[in-house]
């Protein structure tokens, strides 16, 4: 699909596989007429320079999909997942996003383990109870995020800007940060870092 417009579309429970969307619009600029993807499956799909702002992505599966330079502001993505089950005991996770704006979006309870986000904007978003284990949020804007009960073990945060990750309330075991980010984490501990 190239330069297509999907307004007021109900794609709930729809299935797409290896589908490409280039410069497509799924809502109006004021976030009205947003498309519904609730419970849909988009497996190994590519969205490039698309606008999904205001769309409902709740409980949808995006395994192996890729977002490139998309606008996805204020999306409702509670229960969003990048993980498909190969069998009863074997999950497989994959999702990538580059230079995509997810600001003001709600990813509560999302399963984003092993997802790779690079240079994305999540500012003022909600990642409460989201599973980000072994994921990467490199060079992302993570300012003013709600992290309550999020799983962050082994998360790669190198180059990201954040101000609400509290090491007293979140398990940061094996989280990867750069030396310049130590000060961002130490603020919640009352430490003053001085570089000589």
Identify what each model region corresponds to.
Residues 1-196:
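Tandem repeat scaffolds
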């Amino acid at each position: 699909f190239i330069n297509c417009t999907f307004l007021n579309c109900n794609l709930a429970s729809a299935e797409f596989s290896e589908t490409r969307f280039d410069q497509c619009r799924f809502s109006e600029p004021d976030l009205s007429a947003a498309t519904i993807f609730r419970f849909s499956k988009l497996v190994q799909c590519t969205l490039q320079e698309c606008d999904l702002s205001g769309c409902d992505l709740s409980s949808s599966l995006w395994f192996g999909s890729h977002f490139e330079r998309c606008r996805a502001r204020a999306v409702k993505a509670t229960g969003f997942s990048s993980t498909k089950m190969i069998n009863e005991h074997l999950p497989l996770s994959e999702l990538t996003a580059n230079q995509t704006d997810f600001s003001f979006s709600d990813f509560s309870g999302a399963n984003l383990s092993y997802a790779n986000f690079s240079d994305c904007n999540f500012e003022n978003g909600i990642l409460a109870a989201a599973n980000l284990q072994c994921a990467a949020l490199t060079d992302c804007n993570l300012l003013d995020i709600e992290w309550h009960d999020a799983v962050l073990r082994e998360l790669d945060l190198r180059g990201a800007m954040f101000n609400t990750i509290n090491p007293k309330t979140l398990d940061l075991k094996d989280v990867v940060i750069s030396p310049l980010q130590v000060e961002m984490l130490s603020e919640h501990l009352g430490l003053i870092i001085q570089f000589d």
